[in-house]
Regions:
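Active-site- or binding-pocket-proximal scaffold segments within functional domains
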Residues: 1-417
């Protein structure tokens, strides 16, 4: 048995000095042959990675970011790369860990949904992976409720039975005699993005903005963790919450041993990249809390990390002979303003009222103007202790969306190493 760890970054993150929490986690992972259990590790920087740090390439990366968030541009390549890695490395009994930030968080949720629907084909059939993804997306467009798992699934000894003649994904799984692994752990920072899918029932506008199948609920996931940003307000960065509660099925085709899925979604102070990382290191103290929380949760689920690297990257302990320094977590860390001028313009574009979260926004003719709409945090949500300490020590920090009733999540405890 081994761990297979997939790390998918947000659009525009790359291996440089201003690194995201996904890349910091990747660097903390034990990857040597001596690691017990062995860990096979995959990292994808995401769409829009900067090849050159000049104005043109930054503009191009930002354009790809908007396009990717709005339409899912580039998602297929990211999903197929990670899926192919799993195809070649998975063996029965292995534990699959999926991590992602931003658009990369949605990527791993799509990957988990794809595995639930078509399974994991054998290595000698990897050339068919693209066809499987097409079938999965067609199923998503013909079955809108599948995004939230609101579908019934039946099977026989050869695999899943197609729901109808349009369920090409189930037919694909039967033809390829696929494997059916479960997903041991999904850990995401601030999932955003949607996908435009074709709709045969739309005559004038032949597409709609939808969730791909099993990206909001997925019974093949055992443990789900999400770190969410309290202070993000950009309309293009709406949080994709996970349905809670839902069930986990050990056997894809048998409900007999189903059990409640282990789910926790925790809110942290800051905007999107204050939670997922990626700002200059000297301004990244807030992002260390969601990083440490995720590392602790994943370690409890069996992930193996190097404690000295965790101490350096997450706790800010200077490592001997290292030319790099990293900040420690601080409740007084910089909280960035992500609403730059370019993003601000998009706040005045009308959106369908079905996406409205904040009650103070007025609806006219089925639409509303987001205009820095706060994220809705429900009563009973999990709020990290660092948020409450920041409120207590900083009089100017008063998030308007903090619920009246919530559960506290304690601060991390520094270990040895």
């Amino acid at each position: 048995m081994k761990n297979i760890v997939i790390c998918c970054d947000g659009t525009g993150n790359e291996i440089n000095e201003n690194i995201s929490n996904v890349l910091k986690l990747y660097r903390c992972l034990r990857k040597t042959e001596k690691t017990t259990p062995h860990q096979a590790v995959f990292y994808d920087p995401g769409v829009g990675t900067l090849a050159q740090p000049d104005t043109w390439h930054r503009f191009k990366a930002n354009f790809n970011l908007v396009l990717g968030l709005a339409t899912g541009y580039g998602l297929d390549d990211n999903v197929l790369s990670a899926y192919s890695f799993l195809v070649h490395n998975y063996e029965e009994g292995d534990r699959i860990f999926l991590f992602g930030f931003s658009r990369g968080a949605y990527t791993v949720r799509v990957l988990a949904g794809l595995i639930h629907k078509i399974g994991l084909i054998s290595p000698d059939q990897v050339n068919l992976a693209g066809s499987g993804l097409v079938a999965y997306k067609q199923y998503s467009s013909s079955t809108p409720k599948a995004g939230r798992g609101l579908v019934s699934e039946t099977s026989d000894e050869d695999g899943p039975l197609p729901a109808d003649r349009f369920d090409l994904a189930a037919q694909f799984a039967r033809i390829t005699s696929t494997r059916w692994p479960t997903i041991h752990f999904v850990g995401v920072w601030d999932t955003v993005a949607s996908v435009i899918v074709p709709r045969a029932d739309r005559f004038f506008v032949g597409f709609s903005l939808e969730e791909l199948a099993f990206t909001i609920a997925n019974p093949s996931v055992r443990i789900f963790r999400q770190a969410a940003a309290i202070d993000e307000r950009r309309c293009m960065f709406r949080l994709k919450a996970w349905t809670d509660p839902q069930m986990f099925r050990h056997n894809r085709f048998n409900d007999a041993h189903a059990e409640p899925q282990d789910i926790r979604q925790v809110w942290f102070a800051g905007v999107h990249s204050d939670v997922g990382g990626g700002y200059p290191e000297k301004d990244s103290a807030l992002s260390k809390y969601p990083l440490l929380w995720m590392i602790d949760e994943a370690m409890a689920a069996g992930l193996s990390v190097n404690p000295r690297t965790v101490n350096q990257l997450a706790w800010g302990v200077q490592r001997k002979n290292s030319p790099f320094s990293y900040v420690a977590p601080s409740i007084r860390g910089m909280l960035h303003d992500s609403m730059t001028a370019a993003w601000r313009l998009l706040e005045f574009l009308p959106k369908s009222a079905t996406y409205k979260e904040w009650p103070q926004r007025q609806v006219h003719f089925g639409c509303y103007i987001p205009d820095r709409e706060p994220r809705f945090i429900p009563d009973g949500a999990h709020i990290h202790e660092s948020v409450l300490m920041r409120i207590a020590e900083m009089p100017d920090y008063r998030p308007v969306n903090l619920p009246a009733a919530y559960e506290r999540v304690p601060l991390p405890v520094k270990g040895d190493g």
